[in-house]
């Protein structure tokens, strides 16, 4: 928001920016820092917003969301990483397997279980953790898309209870909301890349000659180019719908995402 030093952009403006990033194959962790972790922080308390959002705006801080665990797959509530309140601090123990943007991040937002059973929707909390905190170890690795991710191990990592985002044990709904916003941004990035690839393919078919004529005159390739164009346009339409539905009620938003 403008109160936090931003431009008061919404999902549509984020879509436009992400689509342009896709066209340029920008691999910097913008979505992880600004859309995902920024999405959590702007819903935090005033002290958290004042403490952390300026660092994102200035570019001094890079953030990553540590949520994925080997057994969790697509269940965001399936968490074996725990945080136990001990006086003024939470003690975190556990493991996160795929932390996108982790190699560049100096701060993490970590989903942890503070109560309940491993797959319960209640009992999920969000904590801010600095990368240099004692007991936190990171192993970086490349991903198939040319980016990088991290594995993170927490061994009795202590963080202040002031680092809790929102209410303890009630983080599940906020995680679903921000993940939906992230999905919409990633889809926007994807259609930007698809646009460039489709245009490059059409141009190649116009200029590459075989048997004395451009290969774009061959009917089989024309059919393939039409199929590519239709798939691209369908992807654009779906992405627009997802972004327009982000401000709807939970059921409509989840259905679109």
Positions of PLM-derived features:
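A short, Trp-centered hydrophobic/proline-enriched beta-strand micro-motif
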Residues: 59-68
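Charged, glycine-rich active-site and insertion segments that engage polyanionic ligands
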Residues: 251-257
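Glycine-rich beta->alpha junctions and the first turn(s) of the following alpha-helix
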Residues: 8, 22-23, 136-233
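Internal helix-loop-helix
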Residues: 2-50, 54-60, 100-107, 246-249
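Structural signature of FAD isoalloxazine-binding scaffolds in flavoprotein oxidoreductases
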Residues: 8-20, 75-79, 129, 153, ...
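A structural signal for short hydrophobic beta-strand segments in well-ordered beta-sheet cores
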Residues: 81-84
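A short core secondary-structure module
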Residues: 93-137
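Active-site pocket-lining segment
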Residues: 226-249
């Amino acid at each position: 928001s403008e109160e936090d030093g931003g431009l008061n952009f919404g999902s549509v403006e984020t879509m436009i920016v992400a689509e342009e990033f896709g066209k340029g194959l920008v691999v910097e962790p913008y979505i992880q820092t600004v859309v995902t972790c920024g999405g959590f922080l702007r819903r935090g308390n005033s002290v958290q917003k004042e403490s952390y959002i300026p660092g994102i705006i200035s570019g001094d801080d890079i953030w990553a969301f540590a949520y994925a665990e080997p057994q969790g797959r697509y269940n965001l509530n399936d968490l074996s990483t725990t945080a136990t309140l001990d006086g003024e601090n939470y003690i975190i123990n556990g493991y996160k397997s795929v932390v996108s943007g982790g190699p560049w991040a100096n701060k993490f937002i970590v989903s942890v279980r503070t109560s309940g059973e491993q797959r319960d929707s209640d009992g999920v909390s969000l904590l801010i953790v600095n990368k240099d905190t004692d007991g936190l170890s990171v192993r970086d690795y490349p991903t198939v898309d040319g980016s990088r991710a991290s594995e993170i191990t927490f061994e009795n990592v202590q963080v202040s209870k002031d680092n809790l985002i929102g209410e303890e044990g009630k983080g599940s709904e906020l995680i679903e909301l921000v993940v939906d916003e992230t999905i919409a941004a990633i889809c926007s990035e994807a259609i930007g890349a698809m646009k460039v690839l489709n245009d490059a393919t059409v141009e190649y078919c116009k200029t590459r000659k075989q048997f004395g004529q451009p290969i774009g005159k061959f009917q089989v390739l024309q059919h393939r180019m039409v199929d590519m164009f239709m798939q691209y346009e369908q992807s654009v339409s779906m992405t627009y719908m997802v972004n327009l539905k982000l401000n709807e009620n939970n059921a409509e938003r989840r259905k679109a995402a």
